[in-house]
Amino acid sequence: MGRGKIEIKKIENQTARQVTFSKRRTGLIKKTRELSILCDAHIGLIVFSATGKLSEFCSEQNRMPQLIDRYLHTNGLRLPDHHDDQEQLHHEMELLRRETCNLELRLRPFHGHDLASIPPNELDGLERQLEHSVLKVRERKNELMQQQLENLSRKRRMLEEDNNNMYRWLHEHRAAMEFQQAGIDTKPGEYQQFIEQLQCYKPGEYQQFLEQQQQQPNSVLQLATLPSEIDPTYNLQLAQPNLQNDPTAQND
């Protein structure tokens, strides 16, 4: 009874795949050796496993490189030689050196060198190129300066806004302190109305606004800052008509 035919497809199980590879590699090398002995054939066998491990067999011991050279020569191919790589590298370096020298020679007139050997028409072209370059440089410089000016202007506006807010806060705080020090009872909305009016003025108009408020007799600032006109040493006495007409009180 013969063996069943095995379906040729990739073995998914890694362990089974490795076992099958090891067995069949051994069999392949055995058959290759037998073929080389029976038929006097020159055979080279190179096998890489799935993990990258190398296995090789050559019918002539230590002759694998010669066998590969023979294969390449037969097919019109050859392995790259290290000496050839050096020659190619030197050739490329020489080309780059020549190109660099040519570029340096072409740039010398732009630096004002070797102008005596340049004909007038080429000098005109050189002048136009330099003027165009100067124009480009000047445009870029103006762009950068404009950007700097815009940044400075933006910072100035921010500082002015911060200064205005600080100035407004200081005046509001001072007004609140004057109200507290005066100890004057105001109407519920009178102080808030005063603060709202104060916020509508610019920093330069604060002083004028405060002076106007102080000149008004009913102003909260006028009430808060008016000095006392009553002499603290003067004693007040209630008027009693009955006591003024009583003779007994006069004798006392």
Curated annotation (Swiss-Prot):
Expressed in buds, flowers and immature seeds, but not in roots, stems, leaves, seedlings or siliques valves. Expression in seed coat is confined to the endothelium layer. InterPro entries: MADS-box/MEF2_TF, MEF2-like_N, TF_Kbox, TF_MADSbox, TF_MADSbox_sf. PROSITE patterns: K_BOX, MADS_BOX_1, MADS_BOX_2. Transmembrane segments: none annotated. GO terms for molecular function: DNA-binding transcription factor activity; protein dimerization activity; RNA polymerase II transcription regulatory region sequence-specific DNA binding. GO terms for biological process: integument development; plant ovule development; positive regulation of transcription by RNA polymerase II; regulation of cell differentiation; regulation of cell division; regulation of cell shape; regulation of double fertilization forming a zygote and endosperm; regulation of proanthocyanidin biosynthetic process. It holds the Pfam family SRF-TF. Keywords: Coiled coil, Developmental protein, DNA-binding, Flowering, Nucleus, Repressor, Transcription, Transcription regulation. It is found in: Nucleus. Residues 121-174 form a coiled coil. Residues 1-61 form the MADS-box domain. Residues 86-176 form the K-box domain. It comes from the Eukaryota. CDD domains: MADS_MEF2_like (cd00265). The two isoforms were always coexpressed in the tissues investigated. The pigmentation of the chalaza-micropyle region is not under the control of ABS, as opposed to the pigmentation of the seed body. Transcription factor involved in the developmental regulation of the endothelium and in the accumulation of proanthocyanidins (PAs) or condensed tannins which give the seed its brown pigmentation after oxidation. Necessary for the normal activation of the BANYULS promoter in the endothelium body. Is required, together with AGL11/STK for the maternal control of endothelium formation, which is essential for female gametophyte development and fertilization, and seed formation. Interacts with AP1/AGL7, SEP1/AGL2, SEP2/AGL4, SEP3/AGL9 and AGL3/SEP4. This is Protein TRANSPARENT TESTA 16.
